[in-house]
């Protein structure tokens, strides 16, 4: 192989010498136009041509072509040696994972908020010894262990960490490995602040938009907010705990799908919910997109009635009106309303987004990268939706690790609208990390895309993370040898 390259190099070196001589003769020729002469001079000064590179020694050729690769890392020889974790109190309980290698570099990922870190730990035995730069290969090995919502947390967390590692190994940002970027900043959407009085809420909204700089907001419009109004709901007391979507228990309201609760909204209830939106819209104005979410577990007909009552407020979208699996119901709602519909935060893999996209059952898809499959799979989801004329917003509720993974994916996906930030009012959230290129994590409602920082472009500030470990598990990236042994045959076909 070496002798072949050297023969090619010798031949190209001779051609380069002839090309250089001919170029100089044309530059010196008085008949050559100034524009042509300037162009020829620039080609001579603009860097090494392919033939020039081939004219180098074999060793110099390798050095030139791998000049961006970190010298302390040999990507082709990287091997995964460990997977460790810590659990933070971000959004109650969110785990960060770290994948270590034989060359001292590591990658950071995140198991989705509320998910068990064991979703990631059980994958360790499947990836030990693998080269982390073979991201797609490893993803295909482990994706069978993912599922909807938090069940995908382990697979997606590992995938995030692999892109962080790969970017560090090749000294390029993760977005570059996804094919390049469409934008230098990523627009963020945030929740509308809640308050006890309209005057206080107006003050908080102005702070959110004018001081913090957020130009896209989202509010909750829940039947839980009208449950105490007499005559607002039919069948409101069937569930003893009320109508909170956060209840536990398998027979609770929260675990009863929308068509099966028997709860209906009366005209009085619709007026009350519309008034809630009217109040916020009047404070926000119409220059800022306003999205809505968390309506409650109501059936298809009540979703349409509520949507029509809110159409006049020109909302950016109605989110998750029914469970994502109910494609036909989503399509019926979408066709009945003027307001855009959206779902997707609990969907794993492109194949499960396709029914919604192919049937144009929603106007906007809304993957959560920590559930949808990680950076590359989420970009594929966005690209597929783009072909069908559907936009993509991104759900995100986690630490700065998943936040930055989303930023890289959003930068690399053309039909992107806005990225959710669920910890705007958590004062210590940004302090968990430092950016490796000195940029701000968030600047006036936008996330600057790391233009040169390798991988995800952030590192943990250990002493700060340790202040916010979950009391149920205060370990911090300790070895996990108990997860080294693989104990099953994983092939899914015979």
Give the role of each language-model region.
Residues 1-35:
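N-terminal secretory signal peptides
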Residues 32-41, 50-72:
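N-terminal twin-arginine translocation
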Residues 68-108, 112, 426-432, 494:
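Structured beta-strand/loop patches that form or line metal/cofactor-binding pockets in enzymes
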Residues 102-175, 488-489, 493:
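Metal- or metallocofactor-binding catalytic centers and their adjacent structured scaffolds
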Residues 108, 169, 203, 391-392:
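Ligand-binding pocket scaffold of soluble enzyme catalytic domains
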Residues 185-331:
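Metal-dependent enolase-superfamily TIM-barrel catalytic cores that perform enediolate-based chemistry
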Residues 456-494:
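Extended hydrophobic packing segments that form well-structured cores
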């Amino acid at each position: 192989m070496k002798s072949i390259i050297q023969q090619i190099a010798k031949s190209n070196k001779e051609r380069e010498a002839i090309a250089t001589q001919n170029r100089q003769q044309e530059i010196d020729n008085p008949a050559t136009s100034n524009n042509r002469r300037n162009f020829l001079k620039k080609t001579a000064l603009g860097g090494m041509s392919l033939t020039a590179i081939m004219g180098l020694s074999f060793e110099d050729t390798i050095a030139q072509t791998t000049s961006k690769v970190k010298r302390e890392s040999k990507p082709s020889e990287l091997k995964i040696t460990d997977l460790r974790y810590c659990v933070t109190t971000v959004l109650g309980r969110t785990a960060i994972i770290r994948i270590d290698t034989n060359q001292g570099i590591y990658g950071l990922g995140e198991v989705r908020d509320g998910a068990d870190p064991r979703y990631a730990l059980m994958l360790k035995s499947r990836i030990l010894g693998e080269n982390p730069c073979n991201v797609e290969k490893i993803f295909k090995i482990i994706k069978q262990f993912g599922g909807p919502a938090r069940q995908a947390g382990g697979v997606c967390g590992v995938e995030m960490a692999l892109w962080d590692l790969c970017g560090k190994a090749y000294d390029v940002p993760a977005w570059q490995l996804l094919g390049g970027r469409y934008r230098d900043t990523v627009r963020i959407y945030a929740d509308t602040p809640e308050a006890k009085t309209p005057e206080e809420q107006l003050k908080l909204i102005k702070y959110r938009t004018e001081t913090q700089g957020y130009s896209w907001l989202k509010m909750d419009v829940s039947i839980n907010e009208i449950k105490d109004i007499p005559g607002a709901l039919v069948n409101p007391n069937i569930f003893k705990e009320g109508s909170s979507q956060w209840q536990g228990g398998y027979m609770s309201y929260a675990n009863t799908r929308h068509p099966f609760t028997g709860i209906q909204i009366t005209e009085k209830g619709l007026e009350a919910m519309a008034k809630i939106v009217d109040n916020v819209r009047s404070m926000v104005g119409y220059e800022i997109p306003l999205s809505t979410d968390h309506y409650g577990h109501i059936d298809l007909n009540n979703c349409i009635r509520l949507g029509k009552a809110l159409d006049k407020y020109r909302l950016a979208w109605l989110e998750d009106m029914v469970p994502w699996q109910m494609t036909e119901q989503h399509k019926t709602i979408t066709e009945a309303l003027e307001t855009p519909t959206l779902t997707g935060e609990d969907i794993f893999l492109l194949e499960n987004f396709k029914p919604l996209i192919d049937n144009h059952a929603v106007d906007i898809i809304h993957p959560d990268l920590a559930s949808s499959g990680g950076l590359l799979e989420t970009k594929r989801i966005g690209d597929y939706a783009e072909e069908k004329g559907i936009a993509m917003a991104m759900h995100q509720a986690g630490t700065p690790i998943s936040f930055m993974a989303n930023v890289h994916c959003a930068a690399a996906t053309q039909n992107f609208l806005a990225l959710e930030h669920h910890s705007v009012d958590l004062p210590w959230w940004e302090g968990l990390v430092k950016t490796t290129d000195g940029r701000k994590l968030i600047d006036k409602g936008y996330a600057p895309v790391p233009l040169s920082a390798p991988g995800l472009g952030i590192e943990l500030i250990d002493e700060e993370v340790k202040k916010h470990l979950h009391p149920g598990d205060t370990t911090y990236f300790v070895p996990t040898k108990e997860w080294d042994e693989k104990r099953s045959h994983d092939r899914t076909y015979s």
